[in-house]
């Protein structure tokens, strides 16, 4: 699956409480950015090295969808999404704050190596079934984030149509759909567990190096 991934799109501020916790305005249309493919790393129980000299590294837990084929107008989510994962959109928060102040793009804060963590991909059960289960992150055994796509400001259909219209959307693209409230910093040797419906589908530890 990983070798087939082409573009990595991310939706910012897509849960109202998360936007508020960072003192951001709630968007009136989808707010998208991207990450380079070099940022992608699978969470297979290994240690992931993150920068230790650029301020705090925050976790942002998200449902990630995988696009199965070229988008055509009128396509529904269940037609175009074949699998899903739980991911971490890791963010250099201090760097991001500086970039915001300068009104510069976020790439340095969002696109660094290993900043797009992703669990194993599992079959996508459909939107309705997906809304019946929560995704969550456990840090050192404690649940620190929990979310459900029912709470998205912009639902999966809107995200897919917006992304396709503005950037194109095809086979192998993935979309990080947004993080709920509860984001926070990572520390050296943190143990992370990515969960779907209470079951772990990815894990890793952190090495600050």
Residue ranges and their predicted role:
Residues 1-166, 170, 174, 182-209:
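Catalytic-core "active-site belt" of small-molecule-metabolizing enzymes
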């Amino acid at each position: 699956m990983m070798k087939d991934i082409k573009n990595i799109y991310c939706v910012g501020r897509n849960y109202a409480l998360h936007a508020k916790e960072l003192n951001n305005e709630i968007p009136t249309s989808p707010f998208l950015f991207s990450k380079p493919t070099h940022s992608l790393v699978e969470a297979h129980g290994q240690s992931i090295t993150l920068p230790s000299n650029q301020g705090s590294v925050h976790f942002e837990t998200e449902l990630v969808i995988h696009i199965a084929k070229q988008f055509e107008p009128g396509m529904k989510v269940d037609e175009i999404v074949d699998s899903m994962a739980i991911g971490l959109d890791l963010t250099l928060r201090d760097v991001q704050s500086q970039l915001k102040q300068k009104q510069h793009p976020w790439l340095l804060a969002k696109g660094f190596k290993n900043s797009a963590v992703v669990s194993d991909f599992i079959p996508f059960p459909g939107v309705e079934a997906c809304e019946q289960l929560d995704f969550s992150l456990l840090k050192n055994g404690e649940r620190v984030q929990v979310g459900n796509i029912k709470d998205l400001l912009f639902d999966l259909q809107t995200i897919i149509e917006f992304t396709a219209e503005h950037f194109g959307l095809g086979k192998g693209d993935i979309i990080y759909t947004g993080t709920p409230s509860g984001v926070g910093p990572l520390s050296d040797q943190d143990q992370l567990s990515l969960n779907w419906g209470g079951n772990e589908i990815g894990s890793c530890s952190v090495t600050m190096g």
